UniProtKB/Swiss-Prot annotation:
One of its GO terms (biological process) is ATP synthesis coupled electron transport. Keywords: Cell inner membrane, Cell membrane, Membrane, NAD, Quinone, Translocase, Transmembrane, Transmembrane helix, Transport, Ubiquinone. Its main location: membrane. NCBIfam families: NDH_I_N (TIGR01770). NDH-1 shuttles electrons from NADH, via FMN and iron-sulfur (Fe-S) centers, to quinones in the respiratory chain. The immediate electron acceptor for the enzyme in this species is believed to be ubiquinone. Couples the redox reaction to proton translocation (for every two electrons transferred, four hydrogen ions are translocated across the cytoplasmic membrane), and thus conserves the redox energy in a proton gradient. Belongs to the complex I subunit 2 family. This is NADH-quinone oxidoreductase subunit N. It comes from Hirschia baltica (strain ATCC 49814 / DSM 5838 / IFAM 1418).
Length: 475
């Protein structure tokens, strides 16, 4: 039957939605006794969805639901990485949620529904499917940002994110309406084959602006530092990894497949957004003392580097974007694991000064942080350097020499705040009590990410790059 075939194509999202709905029933029935089990159930569902998505990367492109839904090898890999990282982000949240009186089963359900939204927007083959997926992710994210009801900062973060996110959603809907109005089609294939027009160009620009907001690209980044600082740390761990990769992958996929004929127009726009993001992220982070705000500016800069691959266009650009974002989210997961591990008996700490003397009190954590910082900064021979090399190479092949120069400048400037973290850990001393031991899953995420970023083991990137390159070429 066609419906069974359609569901098999959308199997990862069907699994997530099905388990989430079962979770709603179990949570309503067993209430508090289901809180801890819900995270394990959600993580298993996300891991299962990642496995199903990975299995789809080896098959040809396929569509479902009368062309509303499409899966290609490129999309399947983006889904697999997003779901896998989301599962880890859910597991590391347990200790924090328990200590902060946030251990509610609704947290897991919101992450699962948001992850299902990621999958829908990645597989969208129609304007309305795209909008539905993005809004499913966004609505879950707004609630997650304000999930700590006892924190004024969390409520403020959720409100800011909601208000500005609603504006971006309006831009997206307006852009979609312009594209539909000037082409008469909502299907991506039909839009790609439609005649060019000025109205379609305006619609493209509005869609690009909305997706840039969702990805935290400058100059649409203003919500990011405040939300990262105010939202609970496990929520920010999720925000900064899985949805970030999914949004950038969606942007790349739409630009390459739907608006490919407008390449000369949007390549310049994305190149400018990339340059602004790299510079804003580099210079904005210099003045930060809060680690979460610093990592917010780091994420803005790193989205700029990923968009360099989008601006490069074609297959090399698509492969470089997904390679870079995969390395970035793994490294970021480890860094936020360290932020989760930064707690004393009186609660969480998240200032740079709280890292003072870490090399003496917690040498293993200091070494891990050093490796991860060097990786996200792009210092050779860490994994992050190879990620930047891939996007720089793609930009050079497209003769975007000025953009590569901006990227180099941004990388050098951003070393200023990355090295502040290293200096605090290794050169300063502290009279404060030592940090408490990290939770088990937090330690696993920290040292797992450190191992993947370590020079001896970056050979996995060559294997991954080959797979992603093949997937990008196939679809």
């Amino acid at each position: 039957m066609d419906i069974l075939n359609d569901i098999s194509i959308a199997a990862p999202e069907a699994l997530l939605i099905g388990v989430a709905l079962i979770g709603v029933l179990l949570g309503a029935t067993f209430k508090q006794s289901f809180n801890g089990l819900s995270r394990l159930l959600g993580a298993l569902a996300l891991a299962g969805a990642a496995f199903l998505a990975a299995s789809q990367s080896a098959v040809d492109a396929s569509t479902a639901f009368n062309g509303l839904y499409k899966v290609t090898p490129f999309i399947a890999i983006a889904k697999a990485v997003s779901y896998g990282v989301g599962a880890i982000a859910l597991l590391v949240a347990g200790g924090y949620l328990h200590r902060e009186n946030m251990n509610k089963f609704e947290y897991t359900l919101l992450v699962m529904f948001g992850s299902a939204g990621m999958g829908v927007m990645l597989s969208a083959n129609n304007l309305m499917t795209l909008y539905m997926g993005i809004e499913t992710l966004s609505l879950s994210s707004y609630v997650l940002a304000a999930f700590n009801r006892d924190s004024r900062r969390s409520a403020e973060a959720g409100l800011k994110y909601f208000v500005l996110g609603a504006l971006a959603s309006g831009l997206l809907l307006f852009g979609c309406s312009l594209v539909y109005g000037y082409t008469g089609f909502a299907s991506f294939e039909q839009i790609a084959a439609a005649d060019q027009s000025i109205g379609l160009t305006f619609g493209l620009v509005l869609i690009l602006m909305a997706l840039s907001f969702k990805a935290s690209a400058a100059p649409f980044h203003v919500w990011t530092p405040d939300v990262y600082e105010g939202a609970p740390t496990p929520v920010v761990t999720f925000f900064s990894t899985a949805p970030k990769l999914a949004t950038v992958a969606v942007l790349a996929n739409i630009m390459f497949t739907v608006f490919g004929v407008y390449e000369e127009s949007w390549m310049l726009i994305i190149a400018i957004v990339s340059a602004i993001s790299m510079l804003v992220g580099a210079f904005g982070g210099l003045a930060q003392n809060n680690i979460k705000r610093l990592l917010a500016y780091s994420s803005i800069a790193n989205v700029g580097y990923a968009l360099m691959g989008v601006a490069a266009g074609e297959v090399n650009g698509a492969a470089s974007v997904l390679t870079y974002m995969t390395i970035y989210v793994i490294t970021t997961l480890g860094m936020f694991g360290i932020v989760l591990a930064m707690r004393r008996r009186d609660g969480q700490v998240e200032e740079i000064s709280d890292l003072n003397g870490l090399s003496t009190s917690r040498p293993g954590l200091a070494v891990a942080m050093t490796v991860l910082v060097f990786s996200v900064a792009g210092i050779p021979p860490m994994a992050g350097f190879l990620g930047k090399w891939v996007v720089f190479e793609a930009a050079l092949k497209s003769e975007l020499y000025w953009l590569v120069a901006v990227g180099v400048i941004g990388s050098v400037v951003s070393l200023g705040y990355y090295l502040r973290l290293i200096w605090a850990m290794w050169a300063k001393t502290s009279d404060e009590e030592a940090l408490e031991p990290a939770d088990g899953m937090v330690s696993v995420s920290i040292y797992g990410a450190t191992i993947l970023a370590f020079p001896v083991l970056v050979i996995w990137i060559g294997w991954m790059t080959g797979i992603i390159g093949t997937a990008a070429a196939a679809g």
